[in-house]
Amino acid sequence: MRQSEPRATRDLQAPAGPLDAAMRRYLAKLAIRWSPLVACALVLALLVALSSVPGVHKAARASQLAARSGLARPSGTYRSSTMATRGSAQGGAAGSNAAGSSGGGSNGTAYGTPGQAGYPTTGTATPPLAETATSGGACTPGAKQFAWSVYAPPCVPAFHGNNGGATSHGVTGTTITLTYRLANSSQQAIIDSVGGAAVPSQHAYLQDLQTYAAFFNTQFELYGRHVVIKAFQGQGDYLAEDQGQDLQGAQADAATAYSLGAFGDVTFLLTSSQPYEQDLAAEHVLSFSPTGMPQSWFDSYAPYEWSIWATGTKIAESYVNTVCGRMAGMPAVFAGSAATRSQTRRFGLLTPDNPEYVRVGSEIQAGLRHCGVSLAKSETYSLDYAQASQEGTAAMAAFRADGVTTVLCMCDPVMPIFFAQAANTQSYYPEWVVPNYLDPAGQQVSSSQWSHAISIDGWPMPPAGQGEAYHAFELAAPGKQPAEQYYMVAYYTMLQVFEGLQAAGPDLTPASFAGGMASLPPSGLGQLGTWAYGNASYTPPTNTLIEWWDPSATSNLDHKQGAWVACDGGKWVTYADASSWAPLHQQLGCFAPPG
């Protein structure tokens, strides 16, 4: 077994008291393994524990945070006549869902489709009948495997014949085994007691995984096999692992997954760790938990690492294309002071000092240099939140002194609170270009700063109780509700797994899984954008929305004031295609009115 590469991230300097130490470590983990759909609710809940850190807004009740998780269904209608099961009564018939909000903010902007502004849904409307399929039957040209997902793969006819039996570790003639590591940490009890309902229930999440797996077993062509999920109690401390500690525990758990016959592992992303994922690869077990890692990391562990979230490299591309195509060489018209709005933009970059963010920050700088943009200032900060106020003050003072008009904040979910407070204190009101940690997180940041913020990786967020993941659960378990509030993560993770299993064909191996994924055509447009793979693509999202923060808009997530609203009429932009940011060298169509 190959030695896991220890993460270079240093442990946080914990203040006195085990509760503060645990909270700071867990918040650092959320920052490292950021997934906006999950992290924002957890971060806001866990900030309750940081009473020793000055200036942090108290989180709302945990029960309210559950509604803030962003697990929303895009509006659209599904045809019940095209839904078919493959021998299971669980399948049910697809219902009809009334059209909901277009996802716009106070100015009525609708989310769109690539190259087309104002498209009112996110691509989940029923496809034409000629392109729908009945799972497991004969396939017509252009048919999809099923009609209930915009991400449905091409139809595969029902398989009859010899599937080759045990074609790979974790595969038999009748089963494909996935494992799930139940998290273990000496500090888990503290995390659970403070976070309350906002902390994911591992057993509830596993239950939802099992529900989706049972349904997908009837919908995808698995060539005589079916997926089984085996859970085991982890030995390693997942919080310590992501700080470069207890690496032997991660190795032991990867060995356990292998001994259980794992072909792949579907551990929840926040209770996985980079060392565990790397050790799974050393055991030749696929992992579906990585989050925010650069493309180079996925390449180095191919074909074993997969994720439903965009790579850090794709996020860097979004920063570069936004700056180079729509901001550089023009006045900082979205800044908060009149004097700054008349100045040509000068950019400053902020990133945490852990290796993953530093690597992504380097990719941003390289891309900017390619289009002739030099940073006026670049700063890193630690994830020691006990020093957050001091570091925020220092960073904003440096940016202000160097005339930075536009802050590129490739930041974790917490530090923008402190940066904004420090900027206010110094009467410094720049433009902000930031990741999107969803509306509830944005509501925690001073609106005098965030009302000048642009997000480079947005998603449409229709009203709660809607979305493809919820609809699929209704089909999987009629009359029941998902057990875990983060069920959408379970849904899209299992969807990715099953797409690869079907595309691999009967001779299932890690290599054929990767080859099958590479062969899949691009999907339609859904809540997570358009999915596409191709060679050396291990994360499917290809596009995103540019958004602006409207402090007056009502959020679809928590019904409070403050929400992200689409720029440019809701046009989707493609990470790798700078031309999709058109009209180039013109100000973004953000705010009301722009400029």
Question: Could you say what each language-model-derived stretch is?
Answer:
Residues 15-45:
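N-terminal export and membrane-targeting signals
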Residues 137, 259-378, 431-456, 461:
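Extracytoplasmic ligand/sensor domains, especially the bilobed periplasmic-binding protein
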Residues 140-145, 150-165, 521-595:
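Solvent-exposed, acidic/polar segments of extracytosolic/periplasmic ligand-binding ectodomains
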Residues 309, 422-492, 587-591:
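Extracellular/periplasmic periplasmic-binding protein-like sensory domains
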Residues 412-418, 460-521:
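Extracellular/periplasmic ligand-binding modules, especially the Venus flytrap/periplasmic-binding
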